[in-house]
Amino acid sequence: MFSHDDARSRILAAACERVSAGGTAGASVRGIAADADVSPALVLHHFGSKDGLLAACDAHVLATISDFKSDALAQGPGMDLLGAVAQSSEIAAPLVRYLARRLVEGGAPVDELVDTMVADAHRYVRAGIENGVIRPSVHEQERTVLLTLWSLGALVLHHHVERLLGYSMLDGPEGVQRWSELGAEVLATGLLTPEAIGAARSQEATA
């Protein structure tokens, strides 16, 4: 998370909060500077421009989430996956809210953000395979993209998650853990019966 011991960290924290609340359009350099108790000139001194500040926010959010996931996977097959998710989501709730807002805005910076998350996810999956947590796949890259977009889609549609399931994914660990339990059930036990999978493959083979 952010250290508030220096001006740069305060600026990053203020920028993330502004983006979370009102998107990038509502995150003016002047407003961020006021929230961080610094001058607008100091914001530009550290980050060059508003775009530079947003890029730094993206990088910090990704690095923090990456650290959480890497620490969890390093525990190997005996890891408490859902516990790790709950603990990290409690710490990273402001960053999750930032991502949920940032992802809906589109554009090249968001494309780059998603591409980086897919690349990071591929690394986590490889580590999980090596540690015995995740099964290998002949479609490893495609599977990684699917899982990443599945997760990001839930963040973008968080309003409907709360409306239909009755809990928020953005306000702390409880909602994220409940969502993760549903996902873990699907991933661990599957959705289709072996007979249904066999029938689908037979149809593909004869198509």
Q: Positions of the model-derived regions?
A:
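Amphipathic alpha-helical interaction segments
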Residues: 10, 98, 116, 139-149, ...
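Short, Lys/Arg-enriched anionic-surface-contact patches
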Residues: 1-10
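Amphipathic alpha-helical packing segments from all-alpha helical-bundle domains
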Residues: 65-70, 107-133, 142
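Amphipathic alpha-helical segments used for helix-helix packing
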Residues: 77, 87-118, 122, 159-163
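C-terminal peripheral helix-coil segments that are non-catalytic and often amphipathic
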Residues: 119, 123, 127-131, 156-207
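Hydrophobic alpha-helical connector segments
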Residues: 56, 67-100, 140, 144
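Solvent-exposed, amphipathic alpha-helical segments
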Residues: 10, 14-21, 68, 98, ...
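Helix-turn-helix
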Residues: 10, 14, 18-52, 56
